[in-house]
């Protein structure tokens, strides 16, 4: 799901939906679908309610859900499958990555940027759609260019969440694995970031010394009112 939330909408729109009804019970044919091959990549992480739902081990990495998550933890997509909400995605990550990695993921979800590197086929389709004007100017996320005008893997978009949203969800999800780590990450965010570099700098300056930072209190992109003299 974290990979899904990194995909620009203009890229998703180039791909057909997945028809799960035409596949066998283990969904073995899913691995050859363009959405999986080009965008999501196997193994796909999925939540199951019983061990019998594990499916193909080469295609899926299944995680057993032992407790009902908060309402709104799943979202329908236009491509024939559901994904965990941004908040629930972060909670699932919390039990599997380090605290600093989780904090970086929270910054990206709450930031005005995403990191997405198109594969060769995706880039070709995107270039063709733009040249044929199938994708209008200023449609979807804005791709950032380097100093030479070349495309980068950084995209500008509106934030998916706020730290307040994460904290509220963590309270609702009390008892689920990863809640403590998610609370920690939300408490150590210093505001909205616009790039991975801003995230790294924020963490280096603001995290406690025993966490590898300088322990300095900061607020990202805080508005500073100027006097008439200024």
Where in the sequence are the language-model features?
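Short gly/ser-rich loop at a beta-strand->alpha-helix junction or flexible surface loop bordering the NTP-binding
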Residues: 1-178
């Amino acid at each position: 799901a974290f990979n899904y939330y990194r995909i620009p909408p203009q890229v998703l729109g180039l791909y057909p939906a997945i028809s799960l009804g035409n596949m066998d019970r283990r969904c073995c044919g899913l691995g050859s679908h363009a959405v999986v091959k080009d965008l999501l990549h196997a193994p796909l992480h999925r939540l199951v309610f019983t061990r019998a739902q594990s499916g193909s081990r080469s295609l899926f990495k299944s995680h057993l859900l032992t407790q009902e998550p908060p309402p709104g933890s799943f979202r329908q997509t236009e491509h024939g499958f559901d994904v965990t909400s941004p908040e629930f995605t972060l909670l699932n990550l919390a039990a599997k990555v380090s605290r600093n990695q989780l904090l970086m993921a929270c910054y990206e979800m709450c930031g005005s940027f995403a990191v997405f590197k198109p594969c060769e086929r995706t880039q070709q389709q995107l270039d063709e759609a733009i040249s044929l004007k199938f994708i209008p100017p200023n449609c979807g996320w804005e791709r950032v260019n380097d100093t030479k005008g070349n495309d980068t893997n950084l995209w500008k978009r509106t934030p998916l969440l706020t730290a307040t949203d994460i904290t509220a969800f963590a309270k609702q999800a009390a008892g689920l694995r990863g809640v403590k780590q998610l609370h920690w990450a939300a408490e150590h965010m210093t505001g909205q970031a616009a790039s991975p570099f801003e995230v790294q700098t924020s963490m280096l300056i603001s995290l406690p010394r025993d966490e590898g930072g300088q322990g300095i209190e900061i607020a990202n992109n805080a508005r500073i009112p100027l006097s008439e003299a200024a």
